[in-house]
Amino acid sequence: MLLELARWLAQDIRGFNVFNYITLRAVLATLTALTISFLVGPKLIRKLTEYKVGQSVRDDGPQTHLVKAGTPTMGGALILIAIVISTLLWADLSNRFVWVVLITTLGFGVIGWVDDWRKVVYRNPKGLSAKAKYFWQSLIGAGVAAYLFHTATVPAETELIVPFFKHLVLPLGAVSFIVLTYFVIVGTSNAVNLTDGLDGLAIMPTVMVASALAVFAYVAGHLYFSKYLGVPYVPGAGELTVFCAAIGGAGLGFLWFNAYPAEVFMGDVGALALGAALGTVAVIVRQEIVLFIMGGVFVMETISVMLQVGSFKLTGKRIFRMAPLHHHYELKGWKETQVVVRFWIITMMLVLVGLSTLKLR
């Protein structure tokens, strides 16, 4: 929106051409999202408290979590507001990828909103039924996958890139691309949601991964940088740098209120949306495997649930004291803040490994 205004003004005042630089707009998107979070956050928290939009806590969870009952939830709406406004202000709105990620993010956010609303209104910690949730997630995920495949303008947009191997590129047909994209988007969405169980646990890894994806998006959308680093060139992908920067700013702003002891929880409206956003960006910039590496904490949390459920159904025994994984460590005696910070450190290490794939080929 502001980019178009700047381009119009640049016809008479050349200084406005500076807004054509993606890097500048990414910085401004971060600051804008951060500012919106700081300004809107306290008001939103007061409203959520006033309307008693409080978190329901599972009876079978760690006993230390019982004090969290009643803490305002659905704070993910704050994140989405900041991301959307910031992106609309600073991104190139003629870029199709910008609209793909915005629509996907908001679509999953709506699913999360309904899920949270049912938890609040009906006082049911399980919220929306699993079948209904996965149906709508699948519908959006498959739709986005089909759109991206059929609107691809260069072969690189539908190729699977294997990190650390310079020339290992796997062309994907329609079915394989759509299936892979579906699992990346839906899988990441649910993985972030599973991780969002402790104060600040999910949001900081999300910020770190989004920041790294911003780098990949910038490189993938830059003809010369992509060629130099051996990254597939995806025309238009650079604008996703602005979107990822908005996620980073909104996430840090939310962390201000979500840090232990949390004043507000993001709820499914935030977790499902953020996971879908990360997955969609990774697909567009062709870094699905790198996302798997950088989002290792999300992966571990998801696998722990799958192993726990599978083991209990097959043998009647549990592998972990409780799943997802963060609860296992809580029951082992780790303090909540220890689990959170240690998972942050792990994510930081994995993000650095992911970024190293830009050069180590």
Swiss-Prot record:
The chain crosses the membrane at residues 21-41, 73-93, 97-117, 134-154, 168-188, 200-220, 237-257, 264-284, 289-309, 338-358. CDD domains: GT_MraY. Its main location: membrane. GO terms for cellular component: plasma membrane. GO terms for molecular function: metal ion binding; phospho-N-acetylmuramoyl-pentapeptide-transferase activity; UDP-N-acetylmuramoyl-L-alanyl-D-glutamyl-meso-2,6-diaminopimelyl-D-alanyl-D-alanine:undecaprenyl-phosphate transferase activity. GO terms for biological process: cell division; cell wall organization; peptidoglycan biosynthetic process; regulation of cell shape. It is found in: Cell inner membrane. Its EC number is 2.7.8.13. It catalyses: UDP-N-acetyl-alpha-D-muramoyl-L-alanyl-gamma-D-glutamyl-meso-2,6-diaminopimeloyl-D-alanyl-D-alanine + di-trans,octa-cis-undecaprenyl phosphate = di-trans,octa-cis-undecaprenyl diphospho-N-acetyl-alpha-D-muramoyl-L-alanyl-D-glutamyl-meso-2,6-diaminopimeloyl-D-alanyl-D-alanine + UMP. Keywords: Cell cycle, Cell division, Cell inner membrane, Cell membrane, Cell shape, Cell wall biogenesis/degradation, Magnesium, Membrane, Metal-binding, Peptidoglycan synthesis, Transferase, Transmembrane, Transmembrane helix. Belongs to the glycosyltransferase 4 family. MraY subfamily. This is Phospho-N-acetylmuramoyl-pentapeptide-transferase. It comes from Methylobacillus flagellatus (strain ATCC 51484 / DSM 6875 / VKM B-1610 / KT).
